[in-house]
Amino acid sequence: MCTGGCARCLGGTLIPLAFFGFLANILLFFPGGKVIDDNDHLSQEIWFFGGILGSGVLMIFPALVFLGLKNNDCCGCCGNEGCGKRFAMFTSTIFAVVGFLGAGYSFIISAISINKGPKCLMANSTWGYPFHDGDYLNDEALWNKCREPLNVVPWNLTLFSILLVVGGIQMVLCAIQVVNGLLGTLCGDCQCCGCCGGDGPV
């Protein structure tokens, strides 16, 4: 597969992942699947918008750039004949780095939240974080420390785990495009062989 085709494949994969990340973050605003009375009772990490910004919005732009690479002709891109395929591939590398950073942001936020656990109503009738250093992950009996919202522990754990996996996959895909983009910049796209009056990659 040539560098342009590879980039298009990566872009097509990133789009649904961005959607899942965006959706997972939205659902976190409804702990246990219910509307909460006070936004202060939501876990702090939810407000960092890891899935909405990191795995969502910041991932759409690289994905669209990757998808458009295969449509760029070998002699130019975006209507500019002086802009060749190599420059387009180099640009995709920059967007891939942006995507990697966005996915990394979502990944880190998710990992921190999973380790910290959700904010909930505790036995002393105050809202806080009853878990420490991920202790609840290996002991489901500790989940009873959270009285409200109902089922907030499995809810947050599931959604942040989804964000963690999505962010990890996105980081890998963006890293692949960095390498792919550099190869396309240095070596050209194999589909450009013989075009524009040339005999080799452009």
From Swiss-Prot:
Residues that carry a glycan: 124, 156
Asked whether the UniProt record includes Thylakoid among its keywords, one would answer: no
For this chain, the Swiss-Prot or TrEMBL PTM comment says: N-glycosylated. Glycosylation is required for the growth inhibitory effect.
UniProt topological domain (Cytoplasmic) ranges: 1-9, 67-93, 180-202
Q: Tell me the keywords, alphabetical order.
A: Glycoprotein, Membrane, Transmembrane, Transmembrane helix
One GO cellular component assignment for this chain's record is: membrane
Keyword Membrane found: yes
Q: Name one Pfam family in it.
A: L6_membrane
Give the residue spans that cross the bilayer: 10-30, 46-66, 94-114, 159-179
Question: Its Gene Ontology biological processes?
Answer: tissue regeneration
Q: Sorted alphabetically, which InterPro entries does this protein's record hold?
A: L6_membrane
Tree of life domain: Eukaryota
Which regions face the Extracellular side of the membrane? 31-45, 115-158
- Membrane topology of this protein: Multi-pass membrane protein
Q: In which tissues is it expressed?
A: Jejunum and liver.
**Main localisation, per the record?**
membrane
Enumerate the subcellular locations listed in this protein's record, separating them with semicolons: Membrane
Give the protein's biological function.
Regulates the adhesive and proliferative status of intestinal epithelial cells. Can mediate density-dependent cell proliferation.
* Family (UniProt): Belongs to the L6 tetraspanin family.
* Name listed for the protein in its UniProt record: Transmembrane 4 L6 family member 4
